[in-house]
């Protein structure tokens, strides 16, 4: 899952800009995909060129970060693109804004091949096409005993050793959720006790990070020995410090997914269903995983241990993940941001 790491200039680009593909000729339809804009050559080879043979259509892209693309779709009242790739928190916003069509799962045969948590992660709307996780990483050479629980973040021996994601990042609000669980309360219902737990954690926190590269720098300089992180940062952290280890938490990690939805103003709904079905297929998912693009959500994908080590992969690992309610989290986020800043702004 790499969406959060790549922010491209928001623009509509033709297929010709992706890997030098030939200019579309006399196709009768134009199929528009809203997408981040990274790994263009691989997407062209693995998805676009093969799908063109199915759709006999011209394919164009609107690229940019989650917020920009969703805002453009909202300003156009759901028109202008056929399908839109988004991270789960932003697709929840799109659902609440009425930007997407409800999904008829019978039109996506490959849904039966993906992990159950990805089939309808946000109710009646689009499926997940890749999966990741948020958990804890630690330097096994410096942290003893090992990290085995979310509650270990509050351990006295980890004073000035921890880094948390900033509250406005993808994983930041999940730190608040874990603080509520540590306090034994529902973080949505009892913010007072939840943020007392956040306050109690403050002495262990060296710095809150806002980007993966910032976290890697904190790890490489030795300032941080434990961090809450998304799994896509692990390889970079291990390149900096070989002993950085993904913790096996008794409560499990938190699932993150990227979704694909059909915009409510799509002019090519049948093609949109075919496209979604295509990217969920075993063949496409296998190539994307092997080439380091996205973690597979299709259960039939087979990876070697070396290929799998960078991904959230396999029934056991996926089965241990917990999903969060983005509708609740998005509703609480404004208050959480204010209270978080009160704690860490002191």
Please name every model-derived segment.
Residues 20-26:
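Sec/Tat signal peptide C-region and signal peptidase I cleavage site
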Residues 27-93:
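Early extracytoplasmic/lumenal segment of secretory-pathway proteins
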Residues 38-44, 80-81, 85-223:
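Extracytoplasmic ligand-binding site segments that recognize negatively charged/polar headgroups
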Residues 89-93, 220-221, 225-243:
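A ligand-binding cleft/hinge motif common to bilobed small-molecule-binding domains
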Residues 132, 196-201, 209, 240-264:
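Periplasmic-binding protein-like
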Residues 135-142, 178-181, 257-269, 287-288:
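A bilobed periplasmic-binding-protein/Venus flytrap-type ligand-binding module shared by bacterial periplasmic
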Residues 263-321:
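Mature extracytoplasmic/periplasmic domains
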Residues 305-346:
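Extracellular/periplasmic bilobal clamshell ligand-binding domains
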């Amino acid at each position: 899952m790499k969406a959060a790491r790549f922010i491209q200039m928001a623009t509509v680009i033709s297929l010709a800009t992706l890997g030098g593909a030939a200019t579309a000729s006399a196709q009768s339809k134009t199929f528009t995909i809203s997408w981040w804009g990274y790994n263009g050559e691989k997407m062209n080879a693995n998805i676009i060129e093969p799908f063109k043979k199915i759709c006999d259509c011209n394919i164009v892209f609107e690229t940019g970060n989650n917020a920009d693309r969703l805002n453009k779709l909202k300003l156009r009242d759901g028109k202008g693109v056929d399908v839109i790739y988004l991270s789960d928190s932003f697709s929840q916003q799109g659902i609440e804004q009425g930007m997407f069509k409800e999904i008829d799962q019978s039109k996506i045969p490959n849904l039966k091949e993906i992990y159950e948590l990805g089939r309808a992660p946000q109710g009646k709307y689009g499926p997940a096409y890749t999966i990741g996780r948020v958990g804890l990483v630690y330097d096994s050479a410096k942290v003893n005993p090992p990290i085995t629980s979310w509650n270990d973040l509050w351990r006295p021996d980890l004073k000035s050793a921890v880094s948390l994601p900033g509250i406005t990042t993808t994983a930041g609000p999940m730190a608040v959720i874990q603080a509520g669980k540590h306090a034994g309360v529902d973080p949505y219902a009892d913010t007072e006790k939840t943020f007392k737990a956040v306050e109690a954690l403050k002495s262990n926190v060296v710095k809150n990070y806002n980007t993966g590269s910032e976290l890697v720098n904190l790890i490489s300089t030795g300032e941080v020995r434990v961090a809450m992180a998304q799994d896509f940062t692990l390889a970079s952290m291990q390149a900096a410090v070989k002993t950085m280890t993904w913790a096996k938490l008794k409560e499990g990690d938190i699932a993150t997914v990227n979704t694909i939805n059909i915009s409510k103003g799509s002019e090519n709904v049948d093609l949109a269903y075919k496209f979604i079905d295509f990217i969920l297929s075993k063949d496409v998912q296998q190539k994307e995983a092997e080439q380091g693009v996205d973690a597979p959500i299709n259960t039939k994908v087979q990876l070697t241990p070396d290929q799998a080590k960078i991904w959230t992969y396999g029934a056991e690992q996926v089965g241990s993940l917990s999903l969060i309610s983005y509708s609740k989290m998005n509703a609480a986020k404004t208050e959480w941001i204010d209270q978080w800043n009160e704690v860490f702004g002191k």
